[in-house]
Amino acid sequence: MKRFLGALVLLAVATASRAQQSPSPASAPPPVRQSFLVLLREQADLSGAAAIPDRLERRRFVFDALNDVADRTQAPLVEELRASGARVRRHFLLNMLEMEADDAAAASIARRPEVSRVASNRPAAMGLVPDALDPGVASAGGRAPLAATTVGENLDIIRAPQVWARGFTGQGIVVGHADTGFAWEHPALKPHYRGFDGSTVSHAYNWHDAVHDAAAGNPCGSDSAFPCDDDSDGHGTSTAGILVGDDGLGAQPGVAPSASLIGCRNMDQGTGTPARYTECFEFLLAPTDAAGQNPRPDLGADVINNSWTCPVSEGCTDPDILRTIVANVRDAGIFVVVSAGNAGDACATITDAPAIYDIAFCVGATDNSDAIAPFSSRGPITVDGSNRLKPDLVAPGVLIPTSVPPDQYTFSFTGTSASAPHVSGAVALLWSAIPPLRGDVDQTEDLLRRSAVPLLSSQDCGPYPGNAVPNAVFGYGRLDVVNALVFWDPLPPRQLVLPHRSRPALKVIAPRTP
């Protein structure tokens, strides 16, 4: 009994000692600040956009409607937050504020009647498949000058050169690049960067950096005033190369070499946040000057490539945020292409935003023999209970030749990150070839699906048997840009032959009407 009593006495003494040594409230450490997203209840009504036939007028309507609501409803809340010491950044694409505050302040804001909810904005690490599929691939790939007359087999597979031969190379189309940045002075990219006119450069309205708090050691730092790729493997430079790359001397990794490239860095060495992704979508909808002011939706992108994912487990805890953003961008007539992800060969492995959304065009990866890449994520989408079909289609994504910083090329860029820019570039080709289609996202998506080369699989996933088209492995099939042009052509039917080295030619009859 004495032993227990002694222990109680010691505990009481120790507790008293700790109480005497505890800091006073005045010397207590300040509350830990975190990044939060404050979503307001009132959101813009964009239902009138679909009835506006003119592409630029529709975009202006969307931009004005979004900003009218944000300007009217955010001001009182911003004033109060800043008065309390919170750091605040305003967003308009979704009526939302980004704030840095402690938990108590966040809880207080969440109770306000005009606030719908407060969500986390913690960093999200982007999933990338390694370049090497096996130990021999990396050494076979590497970095080197691209051969003087190189056009990759991947471009032959989607039949881009035949579209170029018809005079359609993406001219007049603006391609938006949301990624780790890009090395704008790379010889395959510099001629196609909209900020370079052949002699002088202006990054205003052509480049934006959404990374304002880069981690130590980031080679681009924060708020880079010029396009810079902070990924050690040059991820953004590689995806940009597949979009538009062409050095004018024969090295041409790009699908749409005459398209204009603008860009926004939305990741800090592969780590993004919902707010960074939002900010880049905003810039690509309505680019700003070098100070981030005076937005101009008339200078925005036609198509936005997104070779990244934002997993729920790593930051995208509120799926409605990015979905609403993608929906609003789409309402403005901008085509949004996303990678399916690299989660492997099981069914229902497309699990991350934005690939899971019905309104985002999701792309899986094939190799050069039209076999599905083992890493390419499959559908259907089960994480939201919809069981919807994804991917929409597939494109080459294994051992793709493209650009890497500062001025070299790789022959081994691999992943659905490589597949998505094939489709983004194809949209640029189609919209340069078919001006009435430009800005018509619904009809363009339908055209791409109907004209894809149908591919079958032995893998059944949910309600989608692999021996039917569409299926949850290949979607509607593999991208073919010539097919898309022919399927659009309203002239009498023409027989379409889709040759491929790995199998007999597949014959399809193109319909009379798109």
Question: Regions from the language model: what does each represent?
Answer:
Residues 87, 152, 294-305, 360, ...:
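C-terminal subdomain of the subtilisin-like protease fold in secreted/lumenal serine endopeptidases
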Residues 36-39, 89-90, 96-100, 117-119, ...:
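Structural recognition of the beta-strand scaffold that forms the well-ordered cores
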Residues 111-174, 187-190, 374, 379:
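Protease zymogen maturation seam
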Residues 240-243, 262-270, 332, 397-469:
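Hydrolase catalytic cores
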Residues 239, 281, 293, 297-403, ...:
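Catalytic-core segments of hydrolase enzymes
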Residues 30-33, 50, 117, 151, ...:
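Subtilisin-like serine protease catalytic core
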Residues 21-136:
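Inhibitory N-terminal propeptides of secreted protease zymogens
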Residues 8-18:
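Hydrophobic h-region of N-terminal signal peptides that target proteins for export
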